[in-house]
């Protein structure tokens, strides 16, 4: 059944529109390698993801595409092809975000950049958070990096539609 996938596509569409994107370009990532290779590696793309995309289009969500290969859809989104990517599970979205936003200096053995922000859509409240977790390792040591927190706050403000 594709009910949950359709619901998430609808939530992604609404979130984009709420942030001023009139015609959102929504990529829906596949679950399996190579989007299942027509059922060879899994049937989720055939039985759940594609029907959800077709149902979304029937509802008038015309900018939705997929299933998109999960190993390349994020570089396409960063390149401007898509406004948002619907992922099939938590780490599918977090791995590319952290790969792009986290930079580690091996010589100094410290993080130079920790810029990821994650949001949870479909809640009755706005939720934006740092993408590095609680970071207890740096807590109380005075050596933390506030960039991700500042970015999360700025993004939450943007989500309200009140950003300047």
What spans do the regions from the language model cover?
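Glycine-rich phosphate/diphosphate-binding loop of Rossmann-like nucleotide-binding domains
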Residues: 3-67
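Glycine-rich phosphate/nucleotide-binding loop
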Residues: 52-164
